[in-house]
């Protein structure tokens, strides 16, 4: 195998492989959201409303996630991208 063959052999992954990877990411994301409580969407909107009292932000600047590690532990993660002053 020559040095040129080594560089030529690298090919882009097929579209089927890329589609499969994307689908796996989407399914994993949806599985994570499946176990969220019923009150979670309303709680998220109320948190955004409180933040808007002090800072002008849009919905896409706020990320709220609920991670349930086990039956006794839940973690509410809130990420807010604040505008520049």
UniProtKB/Swiss-Prot annotation:
Q: NCBIfam families given for it? A: minE, PRK00296.1
Q: What does this protein do?
A: Prevents the cell division inhibition by proteins MinC and MinD at internal division sites while permitting inhibition at polar sites. This ensures cell division at the proper site by restricting the formation of a division septum at the midpoint of the long axis of the cell.
Claim: Cell cycle is one of the keywords in the record: yes
Picking any one GO biological process from the record gives: cell division
Give the source species.
Answer: Shewanella baltica (strain OS155 / ATCC BAA-1091)
UniProt record similarity statement: Belongs to the MinE family.
Q: Which UniProt keywords apply?
A: Cell cycle, Cell division
Concerning Pfam families, the annotation shows:
MinE (PF03776)
> Corresponding gene?
minE
Protein name as it appears in the record: Cell division topological specificity factor
């Amino acid at each position: 195998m020559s040095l040129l063959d080594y560089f030529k052999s690298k090919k882009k992954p097929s579209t089927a492989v890329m589609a499969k990877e994307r689908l796996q990411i989407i399914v994993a994301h949806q599985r994570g959201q499946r176990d969220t409580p019923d009150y979670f969407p309303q709680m998220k909107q109320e948190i955004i409303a409180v933040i808007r009292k002090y800072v002008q932000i849009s919905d896409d600047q706020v990320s709220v996630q609920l991670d349930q590690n086990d039956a006794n532990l839940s973690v509410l993660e809130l990420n807010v991208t604040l505008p520049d002053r």
